[in-house]
Amino acid sequence: MIIFCVAMLLFTFGKDARAQANPSEAANAGKNRILLVLPFDNATGQLSLDWIREAAPAILDARFMSSGFAPMSRADRIYALDHLGLPQQFQPSRAGALKLAQTLDVDSIIVGSYRTEGTGVVAEARVLNVPRLRMSDAVMARGDMNDLIAVFDSLAWRLTRIMDPGFSVAQETFLAAGANLRLDAFEQYIRGISEADQQERQRHLKKSVELSPNFGPAWMALGREDFNAQKYEEAAASFAKVSPNDPQALEAGFYRGLSLLYFGAYPQAQESFANVARELPLAEVLNNEGVALSRQGKDGTGLFVQASAADPNAPDYHFNLALSLKHHGSATNAINQLTQCLKLRPNDTEAQKMLAAWKSPTGMQTDENAEPLERIIRTFDAGAFKQAAQMMDEMEATRLAALSAHERAVRLASRAKEYFNRGLLLEAERLYQAAVTDDARLAEAHAGLASVRERTGDTASARKEANEALQIAPTLDSWLVLGRLDMAANHMDDASREIGEALKLDPASRAAQELKRQIEARTGKKQ
């Protein structure tokens, strides 16, 4: 019975997790894309290393998501187990995992363990293919304990190749994804999200961001802790530290807006909600943006109209629209909206009293200050955000599918460059590879791969891709890659020639001009 209940809950969460898949994976929808990574088994015999149990799925989930998969979140997993009275450390046997898989709405389950080997660590994992009820052979990664993140990055790459044999992103790109994260900061983060005591959680999370000030997940977790403790100014500051490139950026923006609302920073709250709404204009975001606008004495009616249209069955949106309409002189429409609110929630005593007052002979002349404030939506519906993101992804996938192979490759390469410019190398390489698959003669795709290879330290492959791009057509990025590689190898004549070619293509290129300046400084020659 317990296995069945876990399965049914995960069935629900699995559907939400689908929305995290990238639109470029539309052709692979339903093909080993929805994943559940269970905490790894601690086979070290050392309690001090128990934190790695949760570290494993944290790293794997991040790499899988960047690779186009849809891993279920830690929160979803914990929610399911908690509501069934099962411990967070729930670790099914192989037989138990197979039974669980029979009714799960996931495509793959990752189970694994880790052990020490001298001063090193060995991580091992298997993939349970749910549709086939087949467990893969074990894959393994090992390394020094100080390189723990790289060990699990390497393991993630091997597991990805099992789930998608055609996956062509280089292992070096996986390793580069976690290269800038300090292990001590990551450990503090994992301890911070795992501790039972709230003060201990905050202590670890504060230490994490102190050690690694750009570590978004730790800022997000710290913001949550401050928000739950009603420390709204501190929460707003923490949420603001989450990078726009972070997968949780929209959620951080929503809760930052709430935090700002709660301590009266209404213009900043409005801006925060507006930034989220530009990406995902969901009802709760539009409503709260309208509240922030109204609290400044401005007209939020348009936003409340959008919110009530987006979710017409939510009474609070009709309540807020009624208040706004009344404040701006539309009495009849205000009463209609308040009536609709009461149809949806008949026992809303505040709305009942307000409707009775408004219908009285002098009701519409009542002092606005005596009326209730607009209602704030205080919860972030992650499922709704995922579903909305999924709809947008599906629309984009449909648009891509309608293009010719060349047009699709151009679009994918353009999006890949956006990822690259934001430092998201794994996502960038995946889309560049997809572009090459669609059109192997697209010079920009090969040039992009050259840039990724250069960034990950694979100079031979970077040079190969850059030269391949130039055989198709001259591109600025290809000449820049070759110029940087030859300058690093002290081949200054070659570097000078290559940067000269880059400047012929784009005389205004700042990158080319800077490289020219560096070459001149090192050689003492003006080009």
Stretch-by-stretch model annotation:
Residues 197, 228-229, 262-263, 295-296, ...:
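Register position in tetratricopeptide repeats
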Residues 58-62, 75-193:
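Catalytic-center loop of serine/cysteine hydrolases
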Residues 186, 217, 251, 284-285, ...:
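Start-of-helix register in tetratricopeptide repeats
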Residues 182-217, 221-230, 258, 262, ...:
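Alpha-helical segment of the N-proximal tetratricopeptide repeat
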Residues 19-69, 181, 185, 213-216:
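A structural "domain/chain start" motif
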